[in-house]
Amino acid sequence: SAFSFHKARKEVVDAELDYSEKLSKIISEISNKALAIPISLAGSIAIFKLTTKTDWIIALIGLIITAIITSAMIVSQKKQLARISHSKEILFGQLRYRIKDDTSDLKESLEEAIKKLNDNEDFCHKVLDSLLSLAWMPTFIGIIGILFKLMPNIT
């Protein structure tokens, strides 16, 4: 009937909007926290200007702690993304089952919504994976800086 068709279409649209919003929230929440990465990068470059071993060690410990905290936040967001993905699969699986025999464009709309949400989810995974790698870059630059400082003292 027209009523059940309209109801099913509304469910598809509502589900798509809900999951799009949840994916967007993951990226926006982590983007504010990811600002620690460029700040740490500045700190890692500052290691090259430090003169005492105590300063180097304190700066490096600060970089490591920042990388650990940033990584933990990113991993938490990755887990949240996995939970969102799982619930999306359950809901859209139910919708797929309910309209499997539908001959209207509703089935096509559902498949298009699922594809777009999967694309957004893949993008979120790539962003989070990139940020996880970038979170450790300042620490590695700091270690390289300290090694360069120690090189003249090795011989």
Give, region by region, the residue ranges found by the protein language model.
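N-terminal soluble segments of membrane proteins
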Residues: 1, 154-155
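Membrane-proximal, non-transmembrane alpha-helical segments
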Residues: 1-30, 34
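Short, charged cytosolic
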Residues: 1-12, 96-112
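Loop-to-transmembrane boundary segments
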Residues: 18-24, 28-31, 107-142
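Alpha-helical transmembrane segments and their immediate juxtamembrane boundary regions
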Residues: 28-78, 132-135, 139-153
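Coiled-coil heptad-register positions
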Residues: 31, 38, 45, 85, ...
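Short, structured coil/loop segments at alpha-helix boundaries
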Residues: 51-55, 99-114, 122-128, 151-154
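Inner-leaflet juxtamembrane helices
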Residues: 60-103
